């Protein structure tokens, strides 16, 4: 019942949040090219912090940024956040509030804390209608808790889906899209478990990590082929046996430690290999903080 009740919100989320609009034709979808920004308050305190982020996004083809938000940063950094959003919007880059939790799959105080955080983003948008967040990006990771570890252990999934739907309910009134990060482990569920997950939100981001490492002796060609094969495999695994219009689109995320300087090339590989897959929505890069660290 909770899944069907959420369907009334899908249209606006799909239209506004799945893709950006191409300059080559009105309504033509182009893949998402996302970027995580952690410790946003620290980054934005730097001289030209917001401008440097904007310049990086333009140079690397990033069209949306997931900006980490804590209750403290929401209150103390409101002006800097509004400035950043305005700057990125001026360059046609979407901005989503990145909210994290390891426990929000559990009803009660943990989920309540996450929902209060979402309400804070809604209030921010009401105060800053010209510099509003475009969406909520969830990083809810119950699999990090000891009781949820182990192959095939997905007992937390119903609670995770409930958390996703609860966030959508709060975000819908402010026309905020909602997306979430997921791990490969969730794609190994049975048909009903995958249906539950893939009908909970319009878009999910698969964290496709640890396929390769700069120190494992693989050359760029080998890394590329491994990524091409794995990305197709996991897209097939996610949607096997499922059909219907209300299934989430999938963004695939890669991280800097796995590829180093080859990361931009690997991200391009994802688009080249999967652009004809109707379930593929683009890629996301983890993270801007890694870039800043490497540049020091």
What are these regions (language model features)?
Residues 26-53, 57:
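Boundary/entry segment of secreted carbohydrate-active catalytic domains
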Residues 32, 43-45, 85-86, 96-131:
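Active-site-adjacent "subsite" loops/lids of carbohydrate-active enzymes
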Residues 49-72, 131:
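Catalytic domains of carbohydrate-active enzymes, especially glycoside hydrolases
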Residues 67, 71-100, 151-177:
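Aromatic-lined substrate-binding rim segments of carbohydrate-active enzymes
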Residues 96-101, 161-191, 247-259:
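Aromatic-lined carbohydrate-recognition surfaces of secreted/lumenal glycan-active proteins
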Residues 121-155:
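Active-site groove signature of glycoside hydrolases
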Residues 209-256:
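Glycoside hydrolase catalytic-domain groove-lining segments
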Residues 247-296:
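Substrate-binding cleft of secreted/luminal carbohydrate-active enzymes
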């Amino acid at each position: 019942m909770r899944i069907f009740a959420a369907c009334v919100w899908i249209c606006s989320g799909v239209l506004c949040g799945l893709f950006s609009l191409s300059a080559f034709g009105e309504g033509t979808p182009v893949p998402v090219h996302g970027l995580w920004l952690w410790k946003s308050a620290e980054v934005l305190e730097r001289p030209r912090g917001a401008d440097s982020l904007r310049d990086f996004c333009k140079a690397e083809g990033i069209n949306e940024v997931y900006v980490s938000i804590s209750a403290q940063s929401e209150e103390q950094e409101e002006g800097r956040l509004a400035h950043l959003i305005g700057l990125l919007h001026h360059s046609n880059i979407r901005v989503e509030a990145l909210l994290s939790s390891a426990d929000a799959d559990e009803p009660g105080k943990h989920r309540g804390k996450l929902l209060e955080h979402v309400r804070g983003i809604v209030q921010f948008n009401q105060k800053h209608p010209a510099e509003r967040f475009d969406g909520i990006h969830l990083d809810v990771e119950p699999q990090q808790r000891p009781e949820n570890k182990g192959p095939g252990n997905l007992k937390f999934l119903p609670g995770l889906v409930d958390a996703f739907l609860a966030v959508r309910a709060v975000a819908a009134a402010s026309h905020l899209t909602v997306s979430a990060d997921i791990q490969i482990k969730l794609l190994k569920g049975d048909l009903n478990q995958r249906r539950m997950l893939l009908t909970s939100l319009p878009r999910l981001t698969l964290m496709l990590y640890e396929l390769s490492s700069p120190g494992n002796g693989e050359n760029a060609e080998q890394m590329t082929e491994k990524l091409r094969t794995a990305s197709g495999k996991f897209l097939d695994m996610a949607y096997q046996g499922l059909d219907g219009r209300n299934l989430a689109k999938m963004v695939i995320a890669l991280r800097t430690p796995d590829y180093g300087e080859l990361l931009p090339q690997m991200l391009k590989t994802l688009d080249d290999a999967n652009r004809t897959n109707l379930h593929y929505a683009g890629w996301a890069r983890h993270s801007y903080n890694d870039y800043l660290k490497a540049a020091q």
